[in-house]
Amino acid sequence: MARDFPLERVRNIGIAAHIDAGKTTTTERILFYSGVVHKIGEVHDGAAVTDWMAQERERGITITAAAISTSWQDHRINIIDTPGHVDFTIEVERSMRVLDGVIAVFCAVGGVQPQSETVWRQADRYSVPRMVFVNKMDRTGADFLKVNKQIKDRLKANALPIQLPIGAEGDLTGIIDLVANKAYLYKNDLGTDIEEAPIPSEMEEEAAEWRFKLMESVAENDEELIEIFLETGELSEEQLKKGIREGVLKHGLVPVLCGSAFKNKGVQLVLDAVVDYLPAPVDVKPIQGVLPSGKEDIRPSDDNAPFSALAFKVMSDPYGKLTFVRMYSGVLSKGSYVMNSTKDAKERISRLVILKADEREEVDELRAGDLGAVLGLKNTTTGDTLCNTEDPIVLETLFIPEPVISVAVEPKTKGDMEKLSKALTALSEEDPTFRVSTDPETNQTVIAGMGELHLEILVDRMLREFKVEANIGAPQVSYRETIRSSSKGEGKYARQTGGKGQYGHVIIEMEPAEVGKGFEFVNKIVGGAVPKEYIGPASNGMKETCESGVLAGYPLIDVKVTLVDGSFHDVDSSEMAFKIAGSMAFKDGVKKCNPVLLEPMMKVEVESPDDFLGSVIGDLSSRRGQVEGQSVDDGLSKVQAKVPLAEMFGYATQLRSMTQGRGIFSMEFANYEEVPRNVAEAIISKNQGNS
């Protein structure tokens, strides 16, 4: 089967932003103008195509990254609409991993928000080329050039306007295209009757100034263009387009466009810019992976290369389990068998679909560069690689942040226990930042996630999709333990109870590991002091103790253990004896290594009228917060602080009452830090009291 669109004419893009920048509305308009939907859906009416889960339609926020295919100017455009709420960072993270380009949407009034910085950093992590759409230019207080300056200053981006608005706030009548050096005037409310016109005389000077800056910046990166520009002082529309595209793909240039998606202005020009400036799969670096031999290799974006794809999302739906994949190379056919190289398991491809939000189109194959979904995969989860059995490769996977908040959950009726277990399994398969575990002491089921809203929505989904009513406990902070110094540890387990005894003995050296390493085990046994078959069990004993902690029952992180010596008995030694000895040695070592308790610290940004600045700062300090920055702009104060998560429960209510309902805040995980001694002692004694 031949390709519908050559690879050069495919664009895999994401639309990313902070909450309320108008991202879902922008996606809706793109689908309307490119012919996927024939009626405009509004987020605040709860009718948007990409917001297809019931909770999204109710709350007006986008939770899951819906993948939709559309076309524009003979190009296939695959769009992923990503959530702006920080509790759903994994959705943004996983979409950035599989995209080739991003449209970052900013509100013309609010400008750069804390969540915008998070999304921008995620795009930086994966070196995703991007362009900016400054939306909501029809709103009171809209200021295009101010937002452009914020993007340069706060995001350290090489932002360059390629458009200017004609009028602003309620009088937005058109857009100046600096590349083509002309104006587009909107003649009807649907944005379908657009008149090309000369630049209005009152804006000629400003437009000429910005066009000169644009030509200068574009020419800087291209020797051929700089010569033409120095000689003639001018670049043609074609030369500018070529230079901007080069700049976006190679030099971090960020073209900035403007408009109002809600008022149907500027959206077709955004689509034109996607085609003109954002990369095709062949324009970005080939995906890297590791061969079974351990050698690094690449897979080029080419139908003739060996098949490779990354599963970036798993979803349960009425038709079965959908696994979203990004095709990197080769062709994937319906009915074929492939290899999950991450898990070393064979999978059968039952059906293949391309999505238009919650409508689907069955296809016989997916090709390099496509985004689609597979039905019928049994063992594949988020971040797994699928490839040919003859050409195995493991592609680089996703960065998955650790959950920071947990709650106990139980069904309202005993009969729902099995349903609850099914629901939790399905939800944790979909969302790798949602973890399910059982508390060994209380036997309660504990769910952990990225924030209160995240867990609230998951509990809501249990009720809607799985018909399980659940009771939820009070939120608990996910503390961690670690060590601050080095020491030796010894564990000797010897039991003699008639007949065969038990004997295991290990000596370890313990030291702090690099941050983010978790538990690191090194075997330095020489001369067979501990036989090979007992090293694995000893390591497992240590790992299990590590997971249940030593100080207060929280997982120990960033610990390096080196097995240096030990002894065994020909008859009495067993795997179980060495597992117990490993656990004993680990506990012994930790006690001598200055163990400490760590807590999740959150980056908090609070916005309120500046009359309340003193109260806001005072309140954050009383929550053990460290204020890291503050600014006042147009009577609005912004405070950035780092605050322990444990002190932030119920903050939304407190902030509302403190600021007469006019304060808003956003919060995201920053890092783990040591808990002050007096607070740690209280937590440890409380936990030991419960045990």
Curated annotation (Swiss-Prot):
One Gene Ontology cellular component annotation?
cytoplasm
Keyword Protease in the entry? The reply is no
Per the record, a Pfam family? Answer: EFG_C
Main location, first listed in the record: cytoplasm
Which spans are transmembrane here?
A: none
- The residues that hold GTP are 17-24, 81-85, 135-138
Q: Where in the cell is it found?
A: Cytoplasm
Q: Tell whether Phosphoprotein is among the UniProt keywords.
A: no
Domain tr-type G, residue spans:
8-282
Task: Give GO terms: molecular function aspect only.
Answer: GTP binding; GTPase activity; translation elongation factor activity
**Keyword annotations of the record:** Cytoplasm, Elongation factor, GTP-binding, Nucleotide-binding, Protein biosynthesis
Cite the SUPFAM superfamilies for this sequence.
Answer: EF-G C-terminal domain-like, P-loop containing nucleoside triphosphate hydrolases, Ribosomal protein S5 domain 2-like, Translation proteins
Source organism's superkingdom? Answer: Bacteria
Q: Which CDD domains match?
A: EF-G, EFG_III, EFG_mtEFG1_IV, EFG_mtEFG_C, EFG_mtEFG_II
Q: Name one GO biological process term.
A: ribosome disassembly
Fetch the PANTHER family from UniProt.
RIBOSOME-RELEASING FACTOR 2, MITOCHONDRIAL (PTHR43261:SF1), TRANSLATION ELONGATION FACTOR G-RELATED (PTHR43261)
Write out the similarity annotation: Belongs to the TRAFAC class translation factor GTPase superfamily. Classic translation factor GTPase family. EF-G/EF-2 subfamily.
User: HAMAP family attached here?
Assistant: EF_G_EF_2_B (MF_00054_B)
Q: What does this protein do?
A: Catalyzes the GTP-dependent ribosomal translocation step during translation elongation. During this step, the ribosome changes from the pre-translocational (PRE) to the post-translocational (POST) state as the newly formed A-site-bound peptidyl-tRNA and P-site-bound deacylated tRNA move to the P and E sites, respectively. Catalyzes the coordinated movement of the two tRNA molecules, the mRNA and conformational changes in the ribosome.
Query: What protein is this chain from?
Result: Elongation factor G
- Say which species the protein is native to: Prochlorococcus marinus (strain AS9601)
**Could you tell me the gene encoding this protein?**
fusA
